[in-house]
């Protein structure tokens, strides 16, 4: 279910402050965050954000096509390695 249009998109306050501070300094550095639920807004374009996937922070470069999506969509938490292989040789 999508968020109501009369509400603003959710962005964590600490993340918004970090982005505004970097925009005023015009410097590029990785912003580390655990807020996967934050929505990508146009002021984030051009920044690299380290999004936590439960184990480590994955650096994601924000482009204009990502606006409106959540940060967590770009940092997968599960790593599917395939189904267990059947070992028929050990059964014989």
Curated annotation (Swiss-Prot):
Keyword Translocase among UniProt keywords: no
Keyword flag Oxidoreductase: no
GO biological process terms held by the UniProt record: ribosomal small subunit assembly; translation
InterPro entries (alphabetical): Ribosomal_uS19 (IPR002222), Ribosomal_uS19_bac-type (IPR005732), Ribosomal_uS19_CS (IPR020934), Ribosomal_uS19_SF (IPR023575)
Transmembrane segments: none
GO CC annotations on file: chloroplast; mitochondrial small ribosomal subunit
Name of the protein in question: Small ribosomal subunit protein uS19c
Organism the protein comes from: Coffea arabica (Arabian coffee)
Organism taxonomic ancestry: Eukaryota, Viridiplantae, Streptophyta, Embryophyta, Tracheophyta
UniProt gene name: rps19
């Amino acid at each position: 279910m999508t968020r109501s249009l009369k509400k603003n998109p959710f962005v964590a306050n600490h993340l918004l402050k970090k982005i505004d501070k970097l925009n005023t300094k015009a410097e590029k550095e990785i912003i580390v965050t655990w807020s996967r639920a934050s929505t990508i807004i146009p002021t984030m374009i051009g920044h690299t954000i380290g999004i936590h996937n439960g184990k480590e922070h994955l650096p994601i470069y924000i482009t204009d096509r990502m606006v409106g999506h959540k940060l967590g969509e770009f940092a997968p938490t599960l790593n599917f390695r395939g189904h267990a292989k059947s070992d028929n040789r050990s059964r014989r």
